[in-house]
Amino acid sequence: ISEAAPQKFEIILKQGKKQTVIPYELKQRRPSASEVEGFNSSDVLYLIMPDRFANGDVSNDIIPGMLEAKVDRNDPFARHGGDLKGIENQLDYIANLGVTSIWLNPIQENDMKEGSYHGYAITDYYQVDRRFGSNEEFRSLVEQAHSKGLKVVMDMIFNHCGDQNYLFKDMPSKDWFNFKGNYVQTTFKTATPSDPYASDYAKKIVVDGWFSECMPDFNQRNRHVATYLIQSSIWWIEYAGINGIRQDTHPYADFNMMSDWCKAVTEEYPDFNIVGETWIGSNVLVSYWQKDSKVAAPKNSHLRTVMDFPLMDQMNNAFDEETNDWNGGLYRLFDYLSQDIVYADPMNLLVFLDNHDTSRFYRSEAATPVS
């Protein structure tokens, strides 16, 4: 099929006397699709949680048939009504901030019973959540962002999905999910996969354990699961023309499959960039996950960019201290940054003060000292 010309055809599925016909189209590839420009160290990313940003279309606030049919801006765990149209309407405002890229928390369907606003329990990897808009509206947002000189980074989650995902509710095979679809909690010990003293069991629980009871853990060692996830990301790059991917919970997924994924994407799109969420408190342990890391050798993650969570911690401490000795305040940052020598590519670190999982920096004691 890789050699097939663009065309429309039908896929016919049969089971006994039952038959289902699915119309399908192999689309024409966009010119220069493989030359998509990724984000890099010269870019400033503006993080947006779509449900919390701007409501540009009130008609999609509540979609009949979806499990969470409530909008309540007084409830921090409910949906607030933000959508893709709201973001598109504010692109001039965003561009005028001086940022060069937008990082969107997940926009794919998250049809869960509660807490669906954050998007991290995907129920359909190929569809935008209808409360945000449509696939076409997402593509329009990317095109409009590009017209204003803004890149777009898409959040993806390969470690787990939501338990309302059709792939979990009707598994193609029992080994699509770890522990045969039975809930076993991860330990969240992200240092364990690189720990030379960790037992095989300890490593298995981190990687195969579920993030939560409603987030079943994909078995990426299943070649069909791996192919499904890899192809879905390539489809979004081709379809929408995004400039980057931020991969959630990167250390919780299977190392080899994620390495194959990073390699497959960057071989197809040489200038594309992927950043992994590597939430670990040590720069040495974070460096393990970066492409060509000597710490991980002979294994290679092929992940170009990692998130510098240790630097976030250091900055929150440094700005809450007096710079009056050799260790405190800005001296802390001076010494810490010199340790970036542990990274294979120190110029490919995503630096940030906070994100959607942490308190806002400007509300912390470090930013607002009490006199």
Question: Model-found features: residue ranges?
Answer:
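Hydrophobic faces of well-ordered beta-strands that scaffold small-molecule active sites
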Residues: V44-Y46, I102-L104, V152-M154, I245, ...
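The substrate-binding groove and active-site-proximal loops of carbohydrate-active enzymes
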Residues: K70-K85, A121-N135, D163, F211-A226, ...
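Conserved, mostly hydrophobic/aromatic
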Residues: I48, I94, L104, Y125, ...
